[in-house]
Amino acid sequence: MAGSAYDALLQEVYRINDIGRALSVLSWDREVNMPASGDSARVQQMTTLRQLLHQYATSDAFGEAIEAAAAELAGLPDDDDRSCLIRVLRRDLVRSRKLSEAFVLDLSRVGARAWTAWKQAREADDFGSFQPHLARLIELQREMAERYGYDD
């Protein structure tokens, strides 16, 4: 039976997931319902939530909650769902910490501007107007790959 450290960890995971779900709803609404005049405000809202998401998901408190739950669950089989969750959370924490908050914010803003530019370029059948945004996105994705590391 999971104890209080695991339950506390789950509450943190739920909070992080709730922010991610709110981002998804805001993104969907932006793409489907929102008038163009609200775009800059929506981008700011989404960037703020991405910042909070990154802060929570990379915090020392979250890392400590993971380790406290892991200690509490020590001895469980590796294929137990709780053990698997601990492994995934540890992996995600290490991975998320490789991206600075400034990088996450930049990626969020650039991605949002690129989406708007893509939408306008598609309507105007003008790839050239979207190309600089795409180039910047590719540059950021390459930087992310460098931060994460990879094997050739």
Q: PLM features: what roles do these ranges have?
A:
Residues 1-152:
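A well-structured
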